Amino acid sequence: MARTTPLERYRNIGICAHVDAGKTTTTERILFYTGLSHKIGETHDGAATMDWMEQEQERGITITSAATTCFWKGMDAQFDAHRINIIDTPGHVDFTIEVERSLRVLDGAVVVLCASSGVQPQTETVWRQANKYEVPRMIFVNKMDRTGADFFAVVDQVKSRLGATPVPIQLPIGAEDGFKGVIDLIKMKAINWNEADQGMTFTYEAIPAELQELADEWRSHLVESAAEATEELMDKYLEGEELSEAEIKEALRQRTLANDIVPMTCGSAFKNKGVQAVLDCVVEYMPAPTQVKQIQGILEDGTEEERPADDKAPFAALAFKIATDPFVGTLTFFRVYSGTVKQGDAVYNPVKSKRERLGRIVQMHSNSREEIKEVFAGDIAAAIGLKDVTTGETLCDPKSIITLERMEFPEPVISVAVEPRTIADQDKMGIALGKLAAEDPSFRVQTDEESGQIIISGMGELHLDILVERMKREFSVECNVGKPQVAYREAIRSTVKVEGKFIRQSGGRGQYGHVWLKLEPMDITDDEAPIYEFVNETVGGSIPKEYVPAVDKGIQEQMSQGVLAGYPLLGVKATLYDGSFHDVDSNEMAFKIAGSLAMKQGALQASPVLLEPVMKVEVLTPEANMGDVVGDLNRRRGMIEGMEDALGGLKQINAQVPLSEMFGYATDLRSATQGRASYSMEFLKYAEASKHVAETIISARAVI
């Protein structure tokens, strides 16, 4: 089977935004206009194609990233068919991991903003993630028909809150109830969509006279932005020559791919206006797989190598999502970066050093499947039946082994205890939790050694609620859920040198391990910094090389148990600088125990402290309620960072608040403001807990 679409006509894009900006509705319209969906699904009817889990349809939010493929030839059929692989990502902050995972494998992103709410907290989070992976992006300002819609205010917010350079390539004609269509600033024509056929057809018309001056002004901004792409264009522009439509588009494309500018369009997905123009922009301004930075990986000998987006190169792909399908079992979504692979081929997973055979390969359309025989560079597909692959692992050609960069996943910040209601639920619960943990790397399962309880941990209350609900729905497991627990951590504040000795010599073969460690605190506020570092500085064979990894292991085991209240220690640099051994009695176990003892004693001497997770909280409230909201945040040990005006006449309060004080906040905020305020929060950092809080927690859980 040969490739049907050339690689330069591929677009791998994500559609991301804040919850409720109209992201899934936009994707539904894309599927409708590209001919994949014969009836438009509305999220408020619970019928959206991309929201295929029952909980998504009930709650009207998107939880998992559904992937789909469609083809587009342009509004005026001006292109050859382009293959667009779309990933619809969740906008709720508890599911940020899904967004991060998608951006890692995408080449471009369409960020959907609400015309009346503008840039919201989750938008900023998504923007930072897209910056991290250098993903070129465009913006679709949706809901232009909503009360309070203001396109130009949103353009200003994109500059001020996202630090981006927006370049509107369309202007709205009217707003709120009077929103009629858009002005195309490149063609300098008005576009009106036909409401009778759900916007399938449209007409180009003259720009309304009252908007001509505004259109001319924004057109000049657009042309100036395009001219900055190259010196030749700038010279042409400065000499007063007109730039052609093709020159403007090519220049905007170059600057978008370099992440210099962000093209902006507008419309109303719900009212079927403006979505086809978004597809045109995806084709014109988003990169093909050949136009992004080539993927880097590490070969078996430790050297780095780039893999080109080319069918002739050796096969290399990244598994970015595992999902359990009720009909076929485990689906492994993967993005092919280079090479091709057929059904039945062997693939190698270098992370687990395992070889597996690719059974069936399917192209996903939301949750329906089409079997395909072969996938090519640039494709996003799903494999059925891979047993040993988890999120973020590489699949490659067994004859050309490479490990692509792994994805980093955040530590969970909230835990609850779950227990099965009946004996029958007990066995099923183990299987269910195992499958859910394989799907979602930000979800952890562990058993509390003291109480024997099963503890599940995740990124927020909604995250855990939905996982418990999925156990009930998909695996028929009924369980009782305990109160939420905060994931505290421990740290040291001073540098110490400490000796660890483990000696047992009472007849026969004994045990002998002796180490000297230097323990130093590390900065844990930096996201990029490691939370543990081990350095071996022993010289002259004071400890044989083969025992050094055992010391490291002993230190890490003790760190996972903590020294104050049983919470893991973070931010320790441990340097092994001396020690001694016994020719007969020394072994790995003895040195592991010696390392563990030294770590425990040293941490207790190094001014240990308790850390608590602190959340970044943003509250949108009417001005009349500001005093109540600020007072309540102060009572919750919150630190108010600032207040600013938000769209829609609201005020935005920015604060840092310990997670332990935020349980039940949604209910309290609703009652304090008669339901008119809303908030969002995301994990910000670990910070030292106050003396009073630390004493309360340590006395309840003392481990010494």
From Swiss-Prot:
PROSITE patterns xref list: G_TR_1, G_TR_2
Domain spans labelled tr-type G: 8-290
Binding of GTP, residues: 17-24, 88-92, 142-145
Keywords: Cytoplasm, Elongation factor, GTP-binding, Nucleotide-binding, Protein biosynthesis
GO molecular function: GTP binding; GTPase activity; guanosine tetraphosphate binding; translation elongation factor activity
HAMAP family referenced in this protein's UniProt entry, alphabetically: EF_G_EF_2_B
Known role: Catalyzes the GTP-dependent ribosomal translocation step during translation elongation. During this step, the ribosome changes from the pre-translocational (PRE) to the post-translocational (POST) state as the newly formed A-site-bound peptidyl-tRNA and P-site-bound deacylated tRNA move to the P and E sites, respectively. Catalyzes the coordinated movement of the two tRNA molecules, the mRNA and conformational changes in the ribosome.
Name recorded for this polypeptide: Elongation factor G 1
Organism: Pseudoalteromonas translucida (strain TAC 125)
Source species taxonomy: Bacteria, Pseudomonadati, Pseudomonadota, Gammaproteobacteria, Alteromonadales
